[in-house]
UniProtKB/Swiss-Prot annotation:
It comes from Escherichia coli O6:H1 (strain CFT073 / ATCC 700928 / UPEC). It catalyses: UDP-N-acetyl-alpha-D-muramoyl-L-alanyl-gamma-D-glutamyl-meso-2,6-diaminopimeloyl-D-alanyl-D-alanine + di-trans,octa-cis-undecaprenyl phosphate = di-trans,octa-cis-undecaprenyl diphospho-N-acetyl-alpha-D-muramoyl-L-alanyl-D-glutamyl-meso-2,6-diaminopimeloyl-D-alanyl-D-alanine + UMP. The lineage of its organism: Bacteria, Pseudomonadati, Pseudomonadota, Gammaproteobacteria, Enterobacterales. It is a multi-pass membrane protein. This is Phospho-N-acetylmuramoyl-pentapeptide-transferase. It is found in: Cell inner membrane.
Amino acid sequence: MLVWLAEHLVKYYSGFNVFSYLTFRAIVSLLTALFISLWMGPRMIAHLQKLSFGQVVRNDGPESHFSKRGTPTMGGIMILTAIVISVLLWAYPSNPYVWCVLVVLVGYGVIGFVDDYRKVVRKDTKGLIARWKYFWMSVIALGVAFALYLVGKDTPATQLVVPFFKDVMPQLGLFYILLAYFVIVGTGNAVNLTDGLDGLAIMPTVFVAGGFALVAWATGNMNFASYLHIPYLRHAGELVIVCTAIVGAGLGFLWFNTYPAQVFMGDVGSLALGGALGIIAVLLRQEFLLVIMGGVFVVETLSVILQVGSFKLRGQRIFRMAPIHHHYELKGWPEPRVIVRFWIISLMLVLIGLATLKVR
């Protein structure tokens, strides 16, 4: 919005030309989202407390979590608000990639909101019925994937980028839709599963979004894309603004979500942020990179799959409790230790993922 306005005002004052620089807009996008999140935090927490929108804690969970019962949840609303406002202010409104991310972000946020509402108002720990949750998540993911396929069919936008191989980028055809679907829905659920401890999900999300900001900048730059042997996608550059907005909003939320948390993001935040990371990876053609950089989310999800599968097949559990962060809690690790160590692992994985762009 402001970019469009600046383009019309630059003829009156050349200083408005600064709005055309991607690096400038990336920085102010981050700061805008950060300040909005920090400003909304105390007000959102007070309002949620007034409405008695408190966290519902499972009785079969770790005993240390019982003290979290009643902590305001649905704080993801302030994350999404900060991201959307910042992106609308600083990104080019004509960029289709930006709108794809916003559709998934807001759409998954609405699904998460309904899920949270059922939990906090009806005191139902299960929330929205699983089949309906997956149905609407699938509708959004398939809708966006199909639209992207129609527009980008037989172009670099539908190629599969394989790490470590510079010339292996096959056309996916209709498999593009299937891959995009699983990445978007899978990442949404993976971040949701990870969001079980104070600040555990938001910091890896910030790290991954920051990594994708660098990838988006390189993908949208013809020279760097050629240098790194990745597809050049002319719309990808504006995803930098989206990624930095996620970073800013996430850091602002962490101010209130750090241990001991004053507010939880709820499904409205975790589903939306996971879906956003998924669609960003799809748009940048970096699904494999997401698996590496988002390794914490992958491990959390695999721990649940293995736990359920093992119990059904053998009648035995692999972990003391799943997702795996609860396993370490029950082993006696203090919650802050689990959180910070997972953060460190996440940062390492993002750096490793970025390094793979050059190792080809």
